[in-house]
Amino acid sequence: MKVYEILYKVYLLEDISLKEVQREIFRIIDITLGKSEDTLRLHNKNDFKNYCFNSFYPIEKDGVYKEGNIYTITILTIYKSLMTYFNKNLPFAYTTRIRGLKTQLKVLPKKKIRKIYSITPVIIKNDQGYWRGIMEKEEYMKRIKENLIKKYNGFFKTEINEEFEIFKSFEFKNNKPISNNYKGKSLLGDKISIEIEDNVQAQDIIYMSLGTGVGEMNARGLGFMGYRWE
C-alpha cells in the first residue's frame, strides 16, 4: 500500500468564505468523479471512499478566499487508480466558483510516524448527536481505532487481530465542539493530536490513515491529518 498525494492548484472565480470552502472543494471533486462510470460508482457506494482533502492554501487570515487568486488543495488517497484519474481530469474541472489549473503528484514516503494531528475536524457520528456527554473519551478512542481497522480490513480484504495498541497518547486540541456545515446542518467535530505506538501494525494503519482520513465523512473534507515523522 502507498499513500498518493495530489497537489491541486485552482483559480477562484469569486470570493469564497471559510465556512463554504469544504463544500466548494468537494463539489469540484464530485463533478470530476461523475465523469466516469468507475469513479461514479466509488462516489455513490455506501462504503469508505479512501481519499481525503484539506482546505485552500495559503490560508487567508480574514477567512475570505479571494476571487482571482490561486490556491492549492492537497488530496490524499490509497487508490493508485484514483490518483491517476484525478491527475488526468482535475486540471480541466470547474464549477461556477472554482476552475482547476494543474496537479502535481508524489508518493508519501513510509517512515516511522511519531504523531498525527487534525488539519480538518474529525467527525464521529452517533444517533444521539455530538459524542461528549454521551460517551467517555475511552469509547471515543475505541471508535476511532475501530474505524481505522475497518478501513484497513476493507482495503486489504482481510480480518486482522485487533489486540494491539495504536495510541500512545490522545489529546483534544479544542475546548468546545467545532461546527462544520453540511447540507444545511451543523456537524460537530474535534481537533485531535495522537502519538503513535511503535508496533508494525499501528504504524501500517496510521500510514494508511493519511490517505483515508480519520473518523467519518473524509470525502467531505473532514478528518484530514497532518503528521510528524520520528
Regions found by a protein language model. Give the residues of each.
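RNA-interacting cores
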Residues: 1-230
